[in-house]
């Protein structure tokens, strides 16, 4: 089990986009992304909402869970970054 993320854990947009791209499913929940990057869920949620405003990820609610996936622009961005 990975170590519990600390409150000061810095995470980059690129780490989040890469975590979504490398996920087992095309759409992932906020907690899944947070676990993959080793950051707190609230921190990742803030980043994801900003990325959605920039058009790099898309989101929707499925039941009570918000899921995220890369937009076409997000795929191009992270492919160019990698």
Q: Which residues fall in each region the model found?
A:
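Short alpha-helical segments that sit at the start of domains
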Residues: 1-17, 81
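Short helix-capping/hinge SLiMs at alpha-helix to coil transitions
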Residues: 21-25
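A short acidic, leucine-rich amphipathic alpha-helix
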Residues: 32-34
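Short, hydrophobic-biased segments on the C-terminal half of alpha helices
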Residues: 48-49
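Glycine-centered, phosphate/nucleic-acid-interacting loop/turn motifs that mediate DNA/RNA or nucleotide
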Residues: 55
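Short, Lys/Arg-rich nucleic-acid/phosphate-binding segment
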Residues: 61-67
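Short, amphipathic alpha-helical interaction segments positioned at domain boundaries
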Residues: 75-82
């Amino acid at each position: 089990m990975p170590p519990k993320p600390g409150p000061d854990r810095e995470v980059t947009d690129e780490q989040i986009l890469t975590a979504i791209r490398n996920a087992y499913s095309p759409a992932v929940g906020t907690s899944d992304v947070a676990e993959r990057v080793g950051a707190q869920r609230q921190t990742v949620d803030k980043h994801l909402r900003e990325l959605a405003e920039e058009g790099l990820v898309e989101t929707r609610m499925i039941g009570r869970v918000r899921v995220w996936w890369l937009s076409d622009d997000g795929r191009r961005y992270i492919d160019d970054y990698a």
